[in-house]
Amino acid sequence: MSLSSRATLVVLCCLFMLIPSFTTAATEQGLHARSRCESYSFNNGKSFRSCTDLLVLNSYLHFNYAQETGVLEIAYHHSNLESSSWISWAINPTSKGMVGAQALVAYRNSTSGVMRAYTSSINSYSPMLQESPLSLRVTQVSAEYSNGEMMIFATLVLPPNTTVVNHLWQDGPLKEGDRLGMHAMSGDNLKSMASLDLLSGQVTTTKSVNRNMLLVKQIHAIVNALSWGILMPIGVMAARYMKNYEVLDPTWFYIHVVCQTTGYFSGLIGGLGTAIYMARHTGMRTTLHTVIGLLLFALGFLQILSLKARPNKDHKYRKYWNWYHHTMGYIVIVLSIYNIYKGLSILQPGSIWKIAYTTIICCIAAFAVVMEILQFKKRWARLFFKKSKDVEADQPTVSVDVIGETEKAERKKASGGIEIQIENYNITKNFMIPSVFVISYPHTSPPLLAFHSYHHPSTSIAATAA
């Protein structure tokens, strides 16, 4: 037998030895998974013939079902739960969604600690889960809470010979005053629905619907973050900072228009389009995020309309139009950034999304701060330079020349100046004449002339000394 054949035989032997181990592990895992549901015993002594481990939210469903009569006795069991939480289990006899679901709701009173269980019929996508009768007959509704486990018990009567039902289960926080808070809008809370075979206990999920909706929500977040949260601020910065440089005129204007129009219409098509899709499939909830989103589209549309009413640069109303246009633009930017963070808190896609957007916004804000400082220095430098020029123009200028006797005579002759004598460098009399004022004083040999010219915006004076 060759060496390769021996090696192959050894490998096969090892595999055959490992197969029983894999089988045993799988069997133990299956028994363990099955025991999570079947081995549970209720404190009230109730027992159920069937049970199933629900896929998400640490939940289990125990039930007894009589097909001939349609009587369904259930116990919905939710583990690893805070006492300040509410739970719900529902059957939807008409569809797979939330609208039309007939729900059982339970929570623990924050003051007395007593459990409350009641029924609630869900007729919209923004339910308050208030107590209301169901379309199904239901009796013996009760609830229990112990050691982080909350349970709902009830008996429902389904149409006879019903074998498969669409059921939903959910949890959420309990607010002040025992108000039921909104459940999470991401992760497992969006996957808590399935079809239940009452005869076999098999659960069939609707993963495609959940995945499609999650994809739509991600597209909605990305499109709006890029359009309203990034392109819009860049367009505003182009108009504010680039137009101060003549070399960038009119490039800044085209960048501003492209960023604003692209941001608005991409947000209109991608953002509003996905929002309408989600409203049709999961319901339009009147939240602050929704209100701000609609307000942003309205303000953006007004900005577009205002371009038709823009006066010429030399028009007396142009400054008022600029105030309006700039103010509306800044309001849109602030609301956009706030609403993006609001949407991220609803979607809860993971911290990396918020970190990435925050990093981009911080970079844009840092660049804006630097440009504001540069513009401030440039503006004040220009203003200071202008004031210095004005002061310099108002002040007289003085110049002194040393000339010889010959040039002195020529200047005196040309100007018609008056020569007077000065003793001890003290001027005894001043003469203001239209052209030149000449003063002479004794000086040592060789004779020099100190020509002192005094210029003022309104007159010209010269003083000479010999």
Curated annotation (Swiss-Prot):
Residue intervals of the DOMON domain: 57-172
Membrane topology: Multi-pass membrane protein
GO cellular component term, pick one: membrane
Amino acids binding heme b 1: 220, 289
Cofactor remark: Binds 2 heme b groups non-covalently.
Database matches in Gene3D superfamilies: 1.20.120.1770
Cytochrome b561 domain segment(s): 179-380
Protein name: Cytochrome b561 and DOMON domain-containing protein At3g59070
Organism: Arabidopsis thaliana (Mouse-ear cress)
